[in-house]
Amino acid sequence: MAIRRIEGLLHLASEGRYAILVGRFNSFVVEHLLEGAIDTLKRHGVNEDNITVIHAPGAWELPIVAKKLATSNQFDAIIALGAVIRGSTPHFDFVAGECAKGLGVVALESSLPVINGVLTTDSIEQAIERSGTKAGNKGSEAALTAIEMVNLLKAI
């Protein structure tokens, strides 16, 4: 008997329904992440009618909105995008940590892929680099992960 392998593939994703949840705070970075995610989904065959963009105030609010989206049974995956940039107070640590933890809890409780595309950077320059310049576009990478996870969960 052979070992069975199950993988999520990056093939055309025309059937999937994707929610892109965007924190508006640091919008000068987040808008580029959103553009990258939408472009990647469309290039992989996702119809615009199967993409819904939801704007939340910031990264702190993303988990509760993700939970509402997950329980709506309208989506195959949620892509959470935002940017938390370190400042001179511990606020960064609380927001970044609780956002990541909350998104993970939503994914586990709902069995729905909730992709964490929230940047956590030490500087504005790092955030800009990760939103489409030197370090690629993390919004695009999050969309690829969402496609792969939708396909993987369907294959299991």
UniProtKB/Swiss-Prot annotation:
5-amino-6-(D-ribitylamino)uracil binds at F25, A59, W60, E61, A83, V84, I85, N116. Pathway: Cofactor biosynthesis; riboflavin biosynthesis; riboflavin from 2-hydroxy-3-oxobutyl phosphate and 5-amino-6-(D-ribitylamino)uracil: step 1/2. It is an enzyme of class 2 (transferase). Catalyzes the formation of 6,7-dimethyl-8-ribityllumazine by condensation of 5-amino-6-(D-ribitylamino)uracil with 3,4-dihydroxy-2-butanone 4-phosphate. This is the penultimate step in the biosynthesis of riboflavin. Belongs to the DMRL synthase family. SUPFAM superfamilies: Lumazine synthase. (2S)-2-hydroxy-3-oxobutyl phosphate binds at S88, T89, R130. GO terms for cellular component: cytosol; riboflavin synthase complex. Its EC number is 2.5.1.78. InterPro entries: LS, LS/RS, LS/RS_sf. The active site is at H91 (proton donor). This is 6,7-dimethyl-8-ribityllumazine synthase. GO terms for molecular function: 6,7-dimethyl-8-ribityllumazine synthase activity. Keywords: Riboflavin biosynthesis, Transferase. The gene is ribH. GO terms for biological process: riboflavin biosynthetic process. The keyword Transmembrane does not apply. It catalyses: (2S)-2-hydroxy-3-oxobutyl phosphate + 5-amino-6-(D-ribitylamino)uracil = 6,7-dimethyl-8-(1-D-ribityl)lumazine + phosphate + 2 H2O + H(+).
